[in-house]
Amino acid sequence: MQRFTALYASLPEQSRGRLVPEAESPPRTPFARDRDRIIHSSAFRRLKHKTQVFVYHEGDHYRTRLTHSIEVAQVARSIARALGLDEDLTEALALAHDLGHTPFGHAGERELDRLMRPYGGFDHNAQSLRIVTRLERRYAAFDGLNLSWETLEGLVKHNGPLVDDEGNPRGLYRERGLPEAIVEYAAMHDLQLASYASAEAQVAAISDDIAYNAHDTDDGLRAGLFDVIDLGDVPLAGEALATVLKTWPGIDTQRAIHETVRRVISDMIADVIAETRRRAEALAPTSADAVRALGRPLVGFSAQMAEKNRTLQSFLSGKMYKHPQVTGIMERAQRVVRDLFEAYLADQSLLPANWREESFTDDRSRFARQVCDFIAGMTDRFALDQHKRMFDLDPLFR
């Protein structure tokens, strides 16, 4: 397949650079170098034992944050290649998008956010930025990974602008304001928070949706939270299943699940490519900055696919995320986060020595953020082990 570069692609030779200037690293482009730094980071490795929906001990074949991120990167590269975008930047953003997630999935995040409300709250996007700009401490010349402007911009804005043209917070941040980590970093390295991100960042974001829905369908079926028959009335998944059963009558259930998920992913990818090409032809952006200035997303589903996607998400919410088997475990997982946070905040000597060094301060908000950083970086397994060591019980099984 012959490669081409879209007029609106991000060009590595035109990168706005890094906060701390560095010599180039041939033959890698700046974006390829970003991807490599993300892959070699401690935070990326820890994703192996962080939950998507199931706590890590539930089964070896269910997705974790790591397997999910790899799958998002595969989808994202496929779309980027078809659209003529920079594949390295797209992949870097896909691999980094979940770095800031807590143990125990969204349940852990909700509990940590609740506990941190008096101190500025918790936001996984802001935490991802903290990790790559501050918390990873591997290099002699700087904290963080010193990623390029384009990667940081995409990491922060992959779901759209954070503020309006007057600087007022938008969307999820309208009521609570922007997280301090984003405000502080943007003041040093302007991320243009009022504009959309690059097409590559938008591809990474929609690839997350594609992988999430398709693979949670797979995991939910394997876990027995719903069965193949339940998919029959769900647009997209039901259509894919009908095609599979018609093509291979008598196919066994496991193969039917795999073939159905394959078709869901393929159909969504094809739709994004076709719809984005249609928008690009109509809007005619001629550069990456032109994409940022469009005032609307360039990358997206068609109206029909967007509706099917919403229906599938609603189905998964009812059948899977709200299933008693899942919610019961998540409620107990939230207790782990709560117990650990309260214990560390009350007695900083419980923290490891390398996390204690900066903790002796009269600034309780700063100390709470230190505790938050420590807990947010935990894997499910480490959080459970710490809880058992400190409280001599395993709350997931009581």
Residue ranges and their predicted role:
Residues 1-69, 74-79, 88, 108, ...:
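Histidine-centered, transition-metal-coordinating active-site segments
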Residues 82-85, 100:
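Alpha-helix boundary/capping segments in eukaryotic regulatory proteins
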Residues 85-86, 105:
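Helix N-cap / loop-to-helix initiation motif
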Residues 89-94:
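Hydrophobic alpha-helical membrane segments of integral membrane proteins
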Residues 95-96, 113:
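Conserved short loop/turn motifs at secondary-structure junctions
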Residues 105-115:
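A glycine- and small-aliphatic-rich helix-loop capping segment at beta-alpha/alpha-beta transitions
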